[in-house]
Amino acid sequence: MKVPVLIINMKAYPELLGGGAVKLAQVAEKVANNLGASIIVAPPHTYLRQVAESVNIPVYAQSADPVDPGARTGHIPLEFIKDAGASGVIINHSEHRLLLNDIAMLVNKAKALNLETVVCSPDPLSSAAAAALAPTAVAMEPPELIGTGKSVSRTKPDVVVETVNAVKRVNGDVKVITGAGIEDYNDVAKAIELGTVGVLVASAIVKAKDWEAKITELAKPLVGK
């Protein structure tokens, strides 16, 4: 994972239907190339292969199930995510929570498959626990702020700093990013100022009227513009 980074979690918004997921990924790639910024996109599973074949920027899955391939109706093992072209996976988002042993299983298997991992956590203590598993990155997102427009970096800056320090104490190789309520340039700039190396953003981008303008706005602080 190249940092500083902007990770776009597309979630399952209706804007992605009918080719929207591919279009958004292509816009993200255009901005990444224009600014020289690191941008990762995470489309719904149903569009993973289509998006991965349409862009050269990293594509992550939004989640995975802690199971091996086999008689697993409705489950999505990591092997299938990798086969679809993803280079990483988001684990334990607040909208798709897992038990600690399941998180550990996914992180370990992802390493064996050469997939990057971003483990989401709600607070500094959970972030430290996640860091002990040695994922690629930990993304601290207070669930009460997700989708509110009240950014974690400006609403709870002390929690962001505490998370950065907690993760460093456990494993200095684990990258720390943050998310929840990230809406504009200042939110991202503040997150970087507080010691993180990136942000995880969803609705602010997917629901924006002008995807290119919004992604550009949020990516500029990552490259010092």
Curated annotation (Swiss-Prot):
PROSITE patterns given in the database record: TIM_2
Gene Ontology terms describing biological process: gluconeogenesis; glyceraldehyde-3-phosphate biosynthetic process; glycerol catabolic process; glycolytic process
Localization annotation: Cytoplasm
Enzyme class name: isomerase
Pathway: Carbohydrate biosynthesis; gluconeogenesis; Carbohydrate degradation; glycolysis; D-glyceraldehyde 3-phosphate from glycerone phosphate: step 1/1
Entry's EC annotation: 5.3.1.1
Main location: cytoplasm
Residues annotated as catalytic: H93 (electrophile), E141 (proton acceptor)
Alphabetized Pfam families for the sequence: TIM
InterPro entries the UniProt entry points to: Aldolase_TIM (IPR013785), TIM_sf (IPR035990), Triosephosphate_isomerase (IPR000652), Triosephosphate_isomerase_arc (IPR022891)
Keyword presence, Chloroplast: no
Binding-site residues for substrate, renumbered to this chain: N9, M10, K11, I146, G181, A202, S203
Catalysed reactions listed for this entry: D-glyceraldehyde 3-phosphate = dihydroxyacetone phosphate
Keyword list, A-Z: Cytoplasm, Gluconeogenesis, Glycolysis, Isomerase
Gene3D superfamilies listed in its UniProt record: Aldolase class I (3.20.20.70)
Keyword Cytoplasm: yes
GO cellular component: cytosol
Entry GO MF terms: triose-phosphate isomerase activity
Stored PANTHER family: TRIOSEPHOSPHATE ISOMERASE
UniProt record similarity statement: Belongs to the triosephosphate isomerase family.
Subunit note: Homotetramer; dimer of dimers.
Function, as annotated: Involved in the gluconeogenesis. Catalyzes stereospecifically the conversion of dihydroxyacetone phosphate (DHAP) to D-glyceraldehyde-3-phosphate (G3P).
Alphabetical list of HAMAP family matching this protein: TIM_A
Name of this chain's protein: Triosephosphate isomerase
Gene for this chain: tpiA
